[in-house]
């Protein structure tokens, strides 16, 4: 089961953009596309990856919503994708 139920609610077909903090070319596609590409990244690139959402999500313990997913959250989505594919 995915650690964060908020991440589990993000649909695979939601539009998203994966960016790299080092300025590489972004991946524009869906959450599924971003999760698939994240798995292919080397550890250094994973640490610098972020996903910009088209719909903000709530954060536990915060009053505001966010448009950005951190590497740990992208890894959870990649794990969810792996489990659902099997």
Protein language model annotation of sequence segments:
Residues 21-29:
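A short, exposed loop/beta-hairpin motif centered on an aromatic-Gly-Thr core
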